[in-house]
């Protein structure tokens, strides 16, 4: 069991039978009364974010989640992964994969989280390299600073890129924000 003094960002706990992960926390010690910890927690199954306050000394149940490294194989409505430790294939519904589908490429290694034997989500690398398949030519001269244009990458995701990026270029995208980071060297 965890105590409120153990609360940290990334801590996984169980509330009302569902696994939650702590996104933010703040310890508050008022002048009068008992201390408490104010948290922002995210449900790992449905993604709902809650604000929850825990009194000092309150006990929290740890979430028995398991993270396994898996390789993305293909998608046919569902997403299919291979567990390299036992060569077992696992299918995830698109609702579990969510926005991560914008960045998945064949043979990509990711972490899949399981809770009570059921897959509840996946963790992508912070950055992925994707090929630009479609973009308009950048027009020079009619910009002041920081101009960008939309580009479609190999997964079908559309991202804003600087004018110098052309079709066929490899670009790095931050999977946490969905934004262009840099053009990769050829």
Locations of regions flagged by a protein language model:
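Acidic-enriched and Gly/Ser
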Residues: 2-154, 158-186
């Amino acid at each position: 069991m965890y105590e409120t003094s153990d609360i940290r960002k990334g801590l996984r706990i169980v509330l009302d039978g569902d696994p939650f992960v702590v996104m933010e926390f703040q310890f508050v010690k008022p002048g009068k009364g008992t201390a408490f910890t104010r948290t922002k927690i995210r449900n790992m199954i449905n993604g709902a974010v809650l604000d929850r306050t825990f009194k000092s000394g309150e006990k929290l149940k740890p979430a028995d989640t398991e993270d396994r490294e898996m390789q993305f194989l293909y998608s046919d409505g569902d997403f299919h992964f291979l567990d390299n430790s036992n060569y077992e294939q696992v299918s995830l519904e698109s609702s579990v994969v969510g926005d991560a589908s914008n960045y998945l490429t064949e043979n990509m290694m990711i972490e899949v989280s399981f809770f009570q034997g059921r897959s509840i989500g996946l963790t992508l690398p912070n950055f992925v390299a994707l090929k630009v398949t479609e973009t308009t030519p950048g027009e020079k001269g009619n910009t002041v600073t920081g101009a960008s244009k939309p580009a479609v990458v190999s997964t079908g995701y559309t991202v804003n890129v600087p004018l110098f990026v052309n079709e066929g270029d490899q670009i790095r995208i931050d999977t946490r924000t969905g934004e262009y980071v840099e053009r990769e060297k050829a």
